A protein has these predicted regions:
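Serine-esterase "nucleophile elbow" of acetyl-processing enzymes
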Residues: 1-56, 66-75
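Alpha-helical cap/lid subdomain in secreted, periplasmic
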Residues: 3-6, 38-46, 62-202
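Cell-envelope and extracellular/periplasmic
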Residues: 16-17, 53-58, 80-84, 88
Length: 202
């Protein structure tokens, strides 16, 4: 066994926001993925190992199916769980999403792994956002994200868990939309957003 494999292990588990996907732009023309887990590893240095398991487009039901092989069988000390944005994109009920998240939280706890729930970030729509229909659509989507996030925060509070509020960290405080400083497509983070995520997690 090498020295590196003896270090405490943290698994970052989720979808494209865990994979570090971002839409190509001036700062990232070649679609380079910049996972927050890499930033977390930079801060941890030799005090721990970070493994990243993010699958683009994945919904929480799919995350549940691979949780054992990807997380439980690896026996990490901690798992950071971010999921639900794709479910919301398919208009899934926040309560249904939360049931899937709780399955993963509880499976981790039963295996003596510390789960770190993460709230889902907001979204942003620029073109036509001032149109009444678009404004109502956007408000509805943000409201559903906030509903899911309240469920996540309430669960963490009841179980005495620390959770990370990615929504608040990356949202414009006035509009509650995903801030332009951290996203260039209104859905995914940019390198700046992922770096903020990793730094604040640390």
């Amino acid at each position: 066994m090498t020295a590196s494999t003896q270090l405490p292990l943290i698994v970052c588990f989720g979808d494209s926001l865990t994979a570090g996907y971002q839409t190509p732009g001036p700062a990232n023309a070649h679609e380079q993925e910049t996972p927050y887990g890499h930033v977390l590893q930079e801060y941890l240095g030799q005090r721990g190992r970070v493994e990243i398991s993010g699958i683009c487009g994945e919904v929480t039901g799919e995350m549940v199916l691979r949780f054992r092989g990807t997380v439980l069988d690896r026996k990490p000390q901690m798992v950071i769980i971010l999921g639900g944005t794709n479910d919301l994109g398919w208009n899934a009920d926040p309560a249904e999403i939360m049931r899937n998240l709780v399955k993963m939280y509880e499976s981790a706890r039963a295996a003596s792994i510390v789960p770190v729930p993460v709230t889902v970030p907001s979204i942003r729509v620029d073109a036509g956002a001032d149109h009444p229909d678009a404004a109502a659509w956007l408000a509805g989507h943000i409201q559903r994200r906030q509903q899911l996030n309240r469920l996540i925060a309430d669960y963490a509070g009841r179980k005495g868990l620390s959770y990370f509020d990615l929504f608040t960290a990356t949202a414009d405080p006035d509009s509650l939309m995903l801030a332009e400083a951290y996203s260039n497509d209104g859905l995914h983070l940019t390198t700046s957003g992922y770096r903020l995520f990793g730094r604040l997690l640390y």
